[in-house]
Regions:
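Noncatalytic linker/hinge segments flanking ATPase motor cores
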Residues: 68-73, 104, 133-137, 224-229
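Catalytic domains of cell-wall/extracellular-matrix polysaccharide-remodeling enzymes
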Residues: 92-168
C-alpha cells in the first residue's frame, strides 16, 4: 500500500500528533514559508516550529516546502529558505511550491524559478517541485532543469490510482511522480487526522500518497523504518478498517 502523508501550514492549526500517527500517516510536508504577493518580502509560516516539533515527537519524517512567487532577487528567497532548511533539517527533499505567477508572464516566471532551483540544488539537497499540470504546462516553459527535480503532483480525485491514471492531465516535463496530493478541499477530514478543524483550523486537510510503500519511503530517504508499538499497530488497523 502506498504511504499516506499530510502537508500542513498554519491554516491547519495545532495537531494531536499521537492521533496523526495512529491515523496511518507515514510522513508530513510542512510549509516553511514563502513570499508575500505584495512587496515580495519573505516570511516563515507561524506554525512551522510547532509542526516540526510535533512530527519529531512521534518520529515522523518531514519535509519543508517554500511557496514560490517570481520575485527577484532570487538570492533573497533562496537564502531565506535554506536558512530554515539548515535550522530544521528535514529528512525529505526540500520542495518549491509552484502554483502562482503573481501576474508575471511565462518567460519571467520560468526564468526566476529556474534561477531559484539552481541556487537551492545540491547533491545533499535535491529539490522537488509541487504543482498541478493545468498550471505548470501553461505558465512554465520547458527546460532541461526540471528533469533533475522530483515531482509532487496535485490532482484531487478519489477515483484514480495515480495523478493521470485516467489518461488526462499528464505533465509535459515528467513521466513519473514521487508524491501525489490527491485530496484537499471539502473533505472535512482534519479532525480524523488529529487536527482541530473549524473554528481553530481548516476543516479540510491535504492528503498525499508516496509512490511506494512506507518501507520504500524510508529506503528512499536512507533512514531506518521505526518499529510500531502494539498500540500504534492497533490504532492504524482501526484507521484502515473504519476508513479515512
Amino acid at each position: 500500500m502506498n504511504a499516506k502523508g499530510l502537508d500542513l501550514s498554519r491554516y491547519n492549526g495545532r495537531g494531536n500528533w499521537q492521533k496523526v500517527k495512529a491515523a496511518g500517516i507515514s510522513y508530513v510536508i510542512l510549509k516553511a514559508g514563502g513570499v508575500y504577493s505584495g512587496a515580495g518580502d519573505c516570511y516563515t509560516d507561524e506554525l512551522l516550529e510547532n509542526h516540526a516539533a510535533g512530527a519529531r515527537s512521534v518520529d515522523l519524517p518531514f519535509g519543508l516546502y517554500w511557496y514560490f512567487l517570481p520575485f527577484t532577487p532570487v538570492q533573497t528567497q533562496a537564502d531565506y529558505f535554506l536558512a530554515l532548511v539548515d535550522k530544521y533539517k528535514p529528512q525529505l527533499p526540500i520542495v518549491v511550491d509552484v502554483e502562482s505567477s503573481n501576474g508575471k508572464n511565462a518567460k519571467v516566471t520560468t526564468s526566476v524559478l529556474k534561477a531559484l532551483i539552481t541556487r537551492l540544488q545540491s547533491p545533499q539537497k535535491p529539490v522537488m517541485i509541487y504543482t498541478r499540470q493545468s498550471y505548470w504546462d501553461t505558465n512554465i516553459l520547458s527546460d532541461p532543469i526540471w528533469a533533475s527535480c522530483e515531482l509532487w503532483a496535485s490532482r484531487w480525485s478519489s477515483g484514480l490510482t495515480s495523478p493521470w491514471s485516467d489518461g488526462y492531465f499528464k505533465f509535459r516535463d515528467w513521466t513519473n511522480w514521487r508524491f501525489w496530493q490527491f485530496s484537499g478541499d471539502n473533505n472535512a477530514l482534519a479532525i480524523s487526522y488529529g487536527f482541530p478543524g473549524y473554528p481553530n483550523g481548516d476543516p479540510d486537510i491535504d492528503l498525499n500518497w508516496y509512490n511506494g510503500t512506507e518501507a520504500d519511503l524510508y529506503s528512499w530517504i536512507g533512514a531506518a523504518q521505526p518499529v510500531l508499538t502494539l498500540e500504534e499497530r492497533v490504532a492504524r488497523l482501526e484507521a484502515a478498517v473504519f476508513g479515512h
